[in-house]
Amino acid sequence: GIQVDADAKSGTATILVKQKTGERAVFFERATATEPEFLEAHKQLIESAYILHINGRHRQLMRSAMAVAKEVGTIISLDGGAQRYDEDMKAITEDSHIVIVARDYAEKYTGTTNLEDACRIIHERGALIAGVTDGANGSYFVWTDGTSYRCEPFSQATVVDTTGAGDSFHGAFLYMLTKTLCKIADGTNTSTMNETSLSLNAIDLLHSCEHEDLEKAATFASAVAALNTQGIGGRSPLPSLEDIKALIG
């Protein structure tokens, strides 16, 4: 459930959008609430999940959640947004299994402006799947076996608002990845199941993903992010599956 601090204020973001380009500036007022408490209910959710998705906020709580995920084999997915990297995030990034970050984060974390090299460095530092997003220029990936992939962008004639493009990219990628993990898991739940397949956790399943499935997830995410720029706000322009499929073709 939601933890409520009755005497505190929630964080508030004011977003200004440039009408001609859809570029935005964010002014953020931090919450005055105390750090959320890590509860037994959180632990149980993580233990039953394929993926724990984090973004670097509420770090004490996040580290507790990551510890549980590592213990039970739940995949840790990190969204490294622009202007969000600091030295404290280095260890968190290295401890995450899926690391998909914005260009700004990647450059600060790796020390290079070459995004293909940055993606490779992220992978070499521990990420099973490494990704760097670069807005209208597309994205770069390195899969679990070290194979590189360049995901082309879906260019739009006009961009209304880029708010939420990164969040929608992450959500869409993990949506498609989870579908693949479920499909692989269902394949083990057959009459041929043995002791090895019984012990498979989410990280084991991630290693079993085919390149084609991962590329489809990246393409799907790119399409969702592109369509999400066609309206004001981060949520209201989220597209339907029909619109996504129509764009991908």
Roles of regions detected by a PLM:
Residues 44-47, 87, 94, 125, ...:
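Structured loop/turn residues at beta-strand edges in well-structured enzyme cores
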Residues 13, 75, 98, 128-129:
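Proline-centered loop/turn at the N-terminus of a beta-strand
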Residues 1-50, 245-249:
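Conserved N-terminal subdomain of the carbohydrate kinase-like
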Residues 50-120, 137-139:
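Conserved beta-alpha-beta core of the PfkB/ribokinase-like small-molecule kinase fold
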Residues 1-10, 81, 121, 131-134:
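Beta-strand->loop->alpha-helix junctions that form or flank phosphate-binding loops
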Residues 31-37, 78-84, 112, 205-207:
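Short gly/ser/thr-rich secondary-structure transition/capping motifs
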Residues 114-249:
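Conserved phosphate-binding/catalytic region of the ribokinase-like
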Residues 41-42, 89, 118, 159:
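Acidic, amphipathic alpha-helical patches
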